[in-house]
Design a protein with these regions (language model features):
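Charged DNA-binding/catalytic regions of mobile-element recombinases
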Residues: 1-232
Length: 232
């Protein structure tokens, strides 16, 4: 049942088991879940905990028309569950093309692995005009905001608790988890790294997007770069 309904907690699993004729209580289900090392898979709290001393920047994307790659990049952190435990995934998404530009996995929720990915994306693709994140302490830190400012990038941050302000990253998380992560019980961080690398290559190069008129993120991103070179 957990593999079919990975979002189900002890109460829901109890009710599902009862539908199948099993007389079992919530506490018994919770005990069995602990013994088996499984838990409901959902976005956990405190990934985006604010730091009271850090500056919060305004949200710049409201009513903004975003049609060209490298206009706006968006980034966030999510949990990637494994058979036992979890790791953190940080990814940078080009808003217009939906292309994943860089990503990193980490065992700890620090700023360092986010900075590595940002530097990689800037080195490979240049700088966006605007970089959007939530108000998590990793993104409001002087190290993170300083890196963006040094590159002349405008900083945009979601409203507090407004996940819809970064909706395309949330859709990316859903695709990653339901099309890759929930189908595999990663035994190690290395296995998670390999699985995500394989999926994100598929996501960028092969997976058609309805919002992109059936094109892939790579096609939209590359077409823009080709058009710019031709115009120049």
């Amino acid at each position: 049942l957990h593999l079919h309904y990975p979002f189900a907690g002890a109460r829901m699993l109890r009710d599902l088991l009862r539908q199948e004729g099993h007389a079992i209580g919530r506490r018994q289900v919770a005990t069995l879940m602990r013994r088996m090392g499984i838990e409901a898979l959902y976005r956990k709290p405190h990934l985006s905990r604010r730091h009271p001393a850090h500056t919060i920047y305004p949200y710049l994307l409201r009513d903004l028309t975003i049609r060209r790659p490298n206009h706006v990049w968006a980034a966030d952190i999510t949990y990637i569950p494994m058979r036992r435990g979890f790791v953190y995934l940080f990814a940078i998404l080009d808003w217009a093309s939906r292309r994943v530009l860089a990503w990193r996995l980490s065992n700890t929720l620090t700023t360092d692995f986010c900075l590595e990915a940002v530097r990689e994306a800037i080195t490979q693709y240049g700088c966006p005009e605007i970089f959007n994140t939530d108000q998590g302490c990793q993104f409001t830190s002087q190290e993170f905001t300083g890196l963006l400012k040094d590159q002349g990038i405008q900083i945009s941050m979601d409203g507090k608790g407004c996940w819809r302000d970064n909706v395309f990253v949330e859709r990316l998380w859903k695709s990653i988890k339901y099309e890759e992560v929930y189908l595999h019980a990663y035994e190690t961080v290395g296995a998670a790294q390999q699985g995500l690398a394989r999926y994100l290559m598929f996501y960028n190069q092969t997976r058609p997007h309805q919002a992109l008129d059936g094109q892939t993120p790579d096609q939209v991103y590359s077409d823009h770069l080709t058009t710019r070179r031709t115009a120049a």
